[in-house]
């Protein structure tokens, strides 16, 4: 049995040492002040508490970026590289000052996309400039992606989570 409540992790509305466990699922890279958030998380964890936070690394879904770049080199799917703010590579050094033990647990996974439409839908949903270059050439882009996915399009998943012990 457990309870949950959404709130900003930079100002956690609970007294000290209240929680056995805290989970942050792909959220720390959005924190404006990561140090403040980690201090708050540590503050509200019980002495034997554990903090789980998921992240991804630089290689996560890199094939999709290469795909759109091969179609048009001006396309950038995301101007922000969130994994540089908090990710697999820098997570230990960012979490280490706040926790006695930090461990990375890789989630072994990949994707094999065999249809163009789901991949195109994902690409068009990204936060970059892709719509500026794809929408006017949609039929051409769809044909390009269809050829790439015809034999299966492999996508690397470079993700997992950190377990952090107080």
Regions flagged by a language model, labelled:
Residues 82-166:
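Conserved Class I S-adenosyl-L-methionine
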Residues 50-77:
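Conserved class I S-adenosyl-L-methionine
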Residues 1-15:
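Conserved SAM-binding strand-loop segment of SAM-dependent methyltransferases
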Residues 26-30:
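Short catalytic micro-motifs in class I SAM-dependent methyltransferases
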Residues 35-50:
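A short glycine-rich, Lys/Arg-flanked "PGG" loop and its adjoining helix->strand segment in the class I
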Residues 23:
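A conserved beta-strand element that flanks and buttresses the S-adenosyl-L-methionine
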Residues 20:
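Conserved acidic residues
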């Amino acid at each position: 049995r457990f309870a949950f409540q959404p709130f900003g992790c930079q100002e956690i509305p609970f007294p000290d040492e209240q929680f056995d466990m805290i989970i942050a699922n792909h959220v720390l890279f959005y924190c404006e002040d990561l140090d403040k958030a980690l201090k708050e998380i540590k503050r509200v964890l019980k002495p034997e508490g554990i903090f789980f936070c998921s992240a991804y690394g630089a290689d996560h879904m890199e094939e999709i970026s290469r795909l759109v770049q091969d179609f048009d080199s001006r396309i950038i799917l995301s101007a922000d590289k969130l994994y540089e703010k908090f990710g697999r590579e820098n997570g230990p050094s960012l979490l280490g000052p706040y926790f006695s033990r930090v461990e990375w647990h890789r989630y072994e996974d990949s994707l094999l996309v065999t249809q163009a439409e789901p991949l195109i839908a994902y690409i068009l949903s990204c936060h970059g400039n892709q719509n500026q270059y794809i929408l006017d050439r949609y039929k051409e882009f769809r044909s390009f992606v269809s050829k790439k996915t015809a034999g299966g399009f492999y996508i690397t998943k470079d993700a997992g989570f950190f377990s952090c012990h107080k």
